[in-house]
Amino acid sequence: MKNLKRLGFAAMMIMAGATEMTAQDEVEATVSADVVNQYIWRGTKCGELSIQPTLGVAYKGLSLSAWGSTELSNWGGSKEFDLTLAYSTGGFNIGITDYWFDGGSTKYFKYEAHSTAHIFEANIGYDFGPLAIQWYTNFAGSDYKGDGDRAYSSYVELNAPF
């Protein structure tokens, strides 16, 4: 709990500094939170009633964001904390995300091979206007096949608004 308070205080200080810089350097700050009745990610149910806060800063196409999810209906339920570093210009975008899923006994700063609760994912994509494509691949962390080899799980997304 003490570490959580420190993390919250540090995030508030960073956001306060980013807000001050906005007028001078065009740094954009994002602070938001969503409440969802179910947390579903890529077709997988990851939780019930949850709050999902976001903090982010962006400057000239480069962005750093923190996103989390914790169940409100079950305090011992699923928790997730993600950090994303991304760059975009025109329709092109590229990024790296560190997903952390609370597995009960797995601590956030545990990065040991074959026992971490982190998954590291790279993404690249392009928005053509009427159609956007995005490719995601896990490249490190907890993403292994049954035989222990790296799985490099991948996900492709096509988006055509109508």
Task: Outline where the language-model segments fall.
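Outer-membrane beta-barrel proteins
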Residues: 20-162
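Cleavable N-terminal export/targeting peptides
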Residues: 1-28
